[in-house]
Each structure stands twice: as C-alpha cells, then as structure tokens.
Curated annotation (Swiss-Prot):
The gene is xni. Keywords: DNA-binding, Endonuclease, Hydrolase, Magnesium, Metal-binding, Nuclease, Potassium. It comes from Vibrio atlanticus (strain LGP32). Has flap endonuclease activity. During DNA replication, flap endonucleases cleave the 5'-overhanging flap structure that is generated by displacement synthesis when DNA polymerase encounters the 5'-end of a downstream Okazaki fragment. The lineage of its organism: Bacteria, Pseudomonadati, Pseudomonadota, Gammaproteobacteria, Vibrionales. The keyword ATP-binding does not apply. InterPro entries: 5-3_exonucl_a-hlix_arch_N (IPR020046), 5-3_exonuclease (IPR002421), 5-3_exonuclease_C_sf (IPR036279), DNA_polI_H3TH (IPR020045), FEN (IPR038969), HhH2 (IPR008918), PIN-like_dom_sf (IPR029060), Xni (IPR022895). Residues 189-194 are annotated as: Interaction with DNA. This is Flap endonuclease Xni. Its cofactor is Mg(2+); K(+). K(+) binds at residues 176, 185, 187, 190. GO terms for biological process: DNA replication, Okazaki fragment processing. It comes from the Bacteria.
Length: 257
C-alpha cells in the first residue's frame, strides 16, 4: 500500500486561526475552528498517516540562538490564553485521529524536516501543511508543501517566482539576504535582487566567495561579512537528523466514525 504522510505544522496553523478571533480568550472557538480546518485537510489530502508537530514552549530558543544570539529574539510570546489551551486543543485533535509530536527542545521545523525527508527519501508521498516557506528547501518529487490559508502549493515554480533561485539554494539565499522576521542579518547591502544574481551565477555562498570572477560590487561585502553569511545560512538550513523516537506505524491514520 502506498503511503501518504501529512505533517501539520501545528502552531503555524493554530496561531493563524487564533489571531483573527474577536475574543482571544475563547479557546473553545479556537478548537472548533482548527478542528473544522483539519477535517477539510483530511478530506482533501486523504492521508494514510498524519501527525501534528508542536514547538517546545521553553524560554530556550534552541541551537540556532546559540550560534546566532539575536535569532528570534524579538518574536512575540504566545498569548497566555492560547498557551493554557494547548492541551485541550491537542486532545480535540487526538479525538479526530491526529496524534501530536511535542518537542522537548528542538524546533518544530527541524522535527518536521527530519520526519518528512526520512519518509520522502523512501519514495513515499509527504505533504507538509504550513505557510512557512522555510520548508521549501526540502522540496522533492515526493515532498510537497501546502499553504492551506492561501490555497496554494509552495512548489518549485512558486519558489522560482518568489525568490528566483532553486529550492536547494534557499538556505544560501537567506544566508545572503537575511530573514528580518527572525533577526537573521545576512550580508549588509545584499538584497533579494543581488542574491538572485549571485545564486544564478554560482551554486552557493562558498563557491561565490572563492570565485575569482565575483563582481567587485560584491567582493568587499563578501570579504567583510562571509562569516555572518555562513552563520545565517546555517540557521536557515533545516536539520534532518533528529532522533524522533517513533516509527510510521505509530502515526497511521484511522478515520474516526
């Protein structure tokens, strides 16, 4: 039997639903709305296996903040009513047949990436439900990303139109441009247009840095900020080697009647 694993980027979905509620303390409304959303996802994607991955809620910002202290330093904390309601949300999702993977320190992005790549590398179909374009670096013939809220696939043509690079170059792209929302600086003075030009000519940051024909307008920037670019690429890249502690059989989807 062919496998179709659906991975829900849980807080990505929950926070978007919660943020548009008129009453942020009404967690029952959050539960109802997310359950309705998940039922639509189940009906549309028809998974054989499914799991919702949650970030940890500790003050520790993970390994990325260790190598780049400013990483996500200014990110707004989760609203307290939502934080207190997460257990109830997870229970409601469990009753729909969707188990939750709760991180005890790793970022959800890395957990999602590890599971998705592991299954896709075996030739099975994987769909990640998220608006996070960071997952697009994982794109492959059997791995796809669905932006449920915009009703679109974050696929290779989308990435080429949005960024002008290949999916496998996205970490290099963000290493150059930075990611302002996560306080990732990149190389000062190199924006999207320049990054596209550089990565159209060279496959990655290191090749560009070592190239004798790197245009003069970029040479000084690279020489002065190459270490920043390397660190920013590192934190932009997803880890795919985390020990998950479970197997596919544990997350087989069985429709609840």
């Amino acid at each position: 039997m062919s496998i179709h694993l659906v991975i829900i980027d849980a807080l990505n979905l929950i926070r978007r639903v919660h943020s548009v509620q008129s009453d942020p303390t009404d967690i029952a409304r959050t539960i109802t709305t997310t359950a309705r959303t998940l039922n639509r996802i189940l009906n549309e994607s028809k998974p054989t296996h499914i799991i919702a991955v949650f970030d940890h809620h500790l003050q520790d910002r993970g390994w990325r903040a260790e190598v780049l202290p400013a990483y996500k330093q200014n990110r707004k904390p989760m609203p307290e009513p939502l934080m207190k309601g997460l257990d109830a949300i997870q229970q409601a999702w469990w009753e729909l047949g969707i188990d939750s993977l709760l991180s005890d320190g790793d970022e959800a992005d890395d957990l999602v990436a590890t599971l998705a790549k592991k299954v896709a590398d075996h030739g099975e179909t994987v769909t990640i439900i998220s608006t996070d374009k960071g997952y697009c670096q994982l794109l492959s013939p059997t791995l796809q990303i669905r932006d449920y809220f915009q009703h679109r696939w974050l696929d290779k043509p989308f990435i080429e139109a949005e960024f002008g690079v290949k999916p496998e170059q996205l970490a290099d792209y963000w290493g150059l441009t930075g990611v302002s929302s996560s306080q990732v600086p990149g190389i000062p003075g190199i924006g999207p247009k320049a990054a596209k030009e550089i990565l159209t000519t060279y496959p990655d940051i290191e090749t560009a840095f070592l190239a004798e024909d790197l245009p003069k307008k970029y040479r000084k920037k690279f020489d002065e900020h190459i270490e920043s670019a390397r660190v920013c690429k590192l934190v932009s890249a997803l880890k795919t080697d985390i020990d998950l502690g479970f197997n596919l059989q544990d997350i087989r989807y069985e429709a609840v009647s």
